[in-house]
Each structure stands twice: as structure tokens, then as C-alpha cells.
From Swiss-Prot:
Disulfide links within the chain: none
UniProt key word Ribosomal protein: yes
Keywords: Mitochondrion, Ribonucleoprotein, Ribosomal protein
Protein name in UniProt: Small ribosomal subunit protein mS23
Classification via CDD domains: At1g26750
Record carries keyword Flavoprotein: no
Subunit structure: Component of the mitochondrial small ribosomal subunit (mt-SSU). Mature yeast 74S mitochondrial ribosomes consist of a small (37S) and a large (54S) subunit. The 37S small subunit contains a 15S ribosomal RNA (15S mt-rRNA) and at least 32 different proteins. The 54S large subunit contains a 21S rRNA (21S mt-rRNA) and at least 45 different proteins.
Organism encoding this protein: Schizosaccharomyces pombe (strain 972 / ATCC 24843)
Main localization, broad class: mitochondrion
One Pfam family cited in the UniProt record for this chain: MRP-S25
Xref: PANTHER family: 37S RIBOSOMAL PROTEIN S25, MITOCHONDRIAL, SMALL RIBOSOMAL SUBUNIT PROTEIN MS23
Functional note: Component of the mitochondrial ribosome (mitoribosome), a dedicated translation machinery responsible for the synthesis of mitochondrial genome-encoded proteins, including at least some of the essential transmembrane subunits of the mitochondrial respiratory chain. The mitoribosomes are attached to the mitochondrial inner membrane and translation products are cotranslationally integrated into the membrane.
Subcellular location: Mitochondrion
Similarity comment text for this entry: Belongs to the mitochondrion-specific ribosomal protein mS23 family.
Amino acid sequence: MPKFNANGLLRSFAAEMKKPWTAESLWYETVAKHPPTFQYARRIVPLYDPNKVKSRGKRLRKSMYQPQEIQWPEDKLRKRFYRDHPWELARPQIIAENDGNDQQYCDWSHMDQPRKALSGESVVQRTLWLIENSNMPVENAYDQARKEFYHLRAEQEIQQRVAHDQAQALGAVFTKSDLELGYEMDQNALNSWFDNASQYAEANRTKFTDPSVDISKTTQ
């Protein structure tokens, strides 16, 4: 395949003719008056590109050993509840696995369960019970389960507050919680760092007026 096509050769030679030592060729005027109408240079189109074409076997092998996605109605309700109530995830939870037979000793016709602590899972199971047994839409069942959950949670907080006040009235002394102790330790560390930084900055300012000050002693 030639390096230049006819149109490109004409443009290149026209540029060369501007130089004083280049003479006009005999074919230049003819080609300039009758330029070619199509590309004479033959273009080679690749029939196969290994970088773009992927075999069907590779696509099958990627998805062959992947488990199928399993979706349950509980998953959507659970995700929705904890998205709306993120602080429920901060409550202490029992992570020990049970026997998986909650349906044998849990009656979800009501929210409060004697053998199961109140949590977001209670809202999920109560919503499913209302959908299956009361023929309620998902939105209505979820709203009713949330209202029952809020009512029981408020009762628990009131009971804890009353028990705390009664214990204090009888002489009980409550120490700081782990969270409060952690905050106190962090604040002490910040105060210590602030004092050291203030001393170092003050010594650095007085260095220019009193060269005898040793800055390294202020950081000890």
C-alpha cells in the first residue's frame, strides 16, 4: 500500500513547490485540474479482533459458579426500617444464633413478645403477619407496626426512667457509663495536647527575643 494517496500527494507537492529549488512536475497541473474522486489506497479491515471479541465460554464460566440471588419480603422491610431508624442499630443486640423456630413460640398477632426483645425484627415480623392475616396493604401494615413499636419503646423508656429514679431514692449510686468514660479520656488527651502546644508556641515566640530559651524542654 502506498504511503500517500493521490490527494495527499498533490497537497504535499504543492507545499514543496513553494520552495525556490523545487521545479513543477509535468503531472501536477493535470492532477490539480482533475483530482481523484475516491480513495485509491486500499484499506484493510480486520475481520477478527481478539481484544474486542469474547468467547461465549468465558461469559458462561463467570456466572456458572455464582449463587442465584435470593430475595425475601423481609429483606425489603428490614432495610427500610433501619434506613428510617439508624439509631436502632446502636442498641445492644444478642448475636447468638437461635434454633430458627421462632414461629413456634412467637405470636405476632401482637407486637410484644415475652421471649424476644423488642427490635426492628419485631416490626418486620409484625408487618408480615398483618399482610398475611389481615389482608392489609404493605404500607398500611408497616405504618401500624411502626406505631405499635413506638408505643412499646416509649413504655420501656418510661419504665427504665422510673426504675432509675426509684433506685436513686433508695440510695443507689450509678457510675459513669463506658461511653461517658471514653469521652472523658478523649477530653483529657485533648487538653494535654492543647497545653503542650500552647507551651511550645509561647516558647517559639520568645525565642526571637531570648535565644537562651530551649524549646525542646517545653515538649517534655
